[in-house]
A protein has these predicted regions:
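Contiguous, glycine/small-aliphatic-enriched amphipathic segments in soluble metabolic enzymes
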Residues: 1-108, 149-171
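Flexible loop/hinge segments that line or gate small-molecule binding clefts
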Residues: 103-142
């Protein structure tokens, strides 16, 4: 069904994608491309973002994996800016391994906001079928949530959520 709705492009390492496909016994095939412009319709494509050997061990954080995740995110942002892709959907990242001199953000949502926001604020939306939840706060410790929520922040997030529901979801 997904291939009928869009042309999915994964940014990362084809070797890592193949490892996960094999480990999880997924019947999915993909094309390896250098840019989303080369992505084939009706087929999953992987944009090769690194030629480095990335060690993959499930549930074991690795700084090289963090570096690869940042590189993939940066390539997706670049191709979004170029108009090669319409949407960026991210998977969870390890917030500790991605931290570096150039990436000092609590999470990739804040990073994307800084790289693409032009001063606009982001909104994290979780959804399942017809159910959508928007988060008022981002990646902050639980002890800081109450002091971070203000009337102004709630209003700001509601305006963004309302616009997204109309523009992105046709509600």
């Amino acid at each position: 069904v997904m291939l009928e709705l869009c042309t999915p492009v994964i940014y990362g390492s084809p070797k890592v994608a193949a490892y996960h496909r094999k480990s999880l016994d997924l019947p999915t095939n993909f094309s390896i491309v250098n840019t989303a412009a080369e992505a084939a319709h009706n087929r999953l494509s992987v944009v090769n973002c690194t030629d480095d050997e990335v060690k993959v061990e499930f549930s074991k954080p690795d700084p090289e994996a963090g570096k690869a995740a940042w590189g993939a995110l940066e390539k997706a942002i670049e191709e979004f800016r170029e108009g090669l892709i319409d949407v960026i959907v991210t998977a969870p990242i390890n917030k500790h391994t991605i931290q570096s001199e150039g990436f000092a953000f609590p999470g990739h949502t804040e990073y994307i906001e800084q790289r693409l926001g032009n001063g606009s604020k982001s909104l994290m939306i979780l959804m399942k079928e017809d159910f959508r939840v928007a988060l008022v706060t981002g990646h902050i410790p639980v002890r800081e949530i109450a002091s971070s929520i203000t009337k102004e922040l709630i209003q700001e997030k509601l305006v963004i959520f309302n616009r997204s529901l109309k523009q992105d979801f046709g509600i």
